[in-house]
Every structure is written in structure tokens, then in C-alpha cells.
A protein has these predicted regions:
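Core catalytic alpha/beta fold that binds nucleotide/phospho-ligands
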Residues: 1-219
Length: 219
């Protein structure tokens, strides 16, 4: 695979994307098998950034299932897979979360928002035209997932417990109310992602703004 330099500054992020199309062909389209096959791609990358031989790369699992590198002083990482894209985010000194979703029609987006999002978020979506509502729904969803993953929590924690504000006709999502999270919304940074046509995603972390260096890796 094309290798990204493992020399990473403490003040930056690395966002690496893998093309899952070839893996899908190998696995006959099974999402689970695609995920397992990609371990052969992202484990060597993590080993380089952690500064350990691949054979010594050890993962630990947090109380709510978030994986991390077990070696002391290792960078934090997070992984997301949807459709033909796998994203691997790596950073030092902060806990991060990343999510990516395929933009597919979701006729019940507003009903889902009314059930699982905050009342303010659902009302903001309802005020948008249908096309804008669909995209804004995915922006909110990926932002929420990225924050929950950075916290090391799953969807069961509650999508409504991390609240966002829609701006610019639903094209921008800003942290608003994280009353039930480990830090207030003002402590969080959110970076919107569009890794490929037809996809939206988000990268979330607590702390100062950092530059994000992106790499596209292929077998």
C-alpha cells in the first residue's frame, strides 16, 4: 500500500482513507468481511505510528467497547467504514472520533430525527426543504456519532445527549449542548468531511483546532 509518513506532530491529525471496492470484490460484498480484510491495511499503519513492530501491536478495549492502542504513549485512533470507504483517524494527545456515511435517500429522516435527536434539532430539520433536510440529517448524524465515538460511547448513550445547531441552511453543524457529555460543547471541535462524492462524515475531538493531513491509501 502507499505509505503515509509516521512522523506526526503532536499538533496535527492524520486522516487516512482506504478504498474498499477491491476488498468488497474479495469478500463477495459482505460488510463484515470487508472490515476484517481491511485489518491487513490499517494494522500496519497503526504499528508505524505507534512505533512498534506489527507483531507487537496490541489493542485494548475501553469499558464501552472503544478500541485503543495498549502501548504507552501511543496515539489515539478511530475507524469508520461505510459503503466503499474506510476512514482511519490518528492523533496524539487527544481522543478522537470519526464517522462516515453514504448519502442514500432516507424517506423517514425527519421521523428518525424526531425520535432520536433533540427537539431543537428535529425542528430545524423540519424547517428545511426535503433535499436540504436529507443532507442536514446526515451532517447531524455523523457529527453525533463522531462525538460519541470520541467519548468512547455507542449510540445507546443517546444521540439527543450531544446537541448541535444547524446553520447556513443546514450546511453547517456547530456544537451547542453537551450537558450530558464529559465536557461542554465549547470544549469540542468538529470538522466536516466529504471524503468522496456521495459521502459525508465528521471528525470530532476535545481541544484546540489542529491541522488535518489526509492520505488516500490503496493496496
Amino acid at each position: 500500500m502507499a505509505a503515509a509518513s509516521q512522523s506526526m506532530q503532536d499538533s496535527e491529525f492524520r486522516l487516512l482513507s482506504f478504498d474498499a471496492v477491491a476488498k468488497k470484490a474479495e469478500s463477495h460484498g459482505s460488510a463484515v468481511d470487508v472490515w476484517r480484510l481491511h485489518a491487513a491495511d490499517w494494522r500496519p499503519v497503526l504499528a508505524r505510528y505507534a512505533g512498534v513492530p506489527l507483531a507487537e501491536l496490541t489493542l485494548a478495549v475501553g469499558p464501552h467497547g472503544k478500541p485503543s492502542l495498549a502501548a504507552p504513549s501511543s496515539p489515539d485512533f478511530n475507524l469508520s467504514h461505510c459503503g466503499d470507504i474506510v476512514l482511519l483517524a490518528i492523533a496524539r494527545g487527544v481522543e478522537i472520533g470519526v464517522d462516515v456515511e453514504v448519502l442514500r435517500p432516507r424517506p423517514r429522516a425527519l421521523q428518525l430525527a424526531q425520535r432520536y435527536f433533540s427537539a431543537d434539532e428535529a425542528a430545524a430539520l423540519a424547517a428545511l426543504p426535503e433535499a436540504e433536510c436529507q443532507q442536514a440529517f446526515y451532517r447531524l448524524w455523523t457529527a453525533k456519532e463522531a462525538v460519541l465515538k470520541a467519548l468512547g460511547r455507542g449510540l445507546a448513550f443517546g444521540l439527543d445527549r450531544v446537541g448541535f445547531r444547524l446553520e447556513a441552511g443546514g450546511t453547517a453543524v456547530l456544537p451547542q449542548d453537551f450537558a450530558h457529555a464529559a465536557a461542554p460543547a465549547s470544549a469540542w471541535m468538529l470538522h466536516a468531511l466529504a471524503p468522496s462524492p456521495g459521502y459525508l462524515g465528521a471528525l470530532a475531538w476535545r481541544g484546540e483546532s489542529r491541522p488535518i493531513r489526509r492520505f488516500a491509501l490503496s493496496p
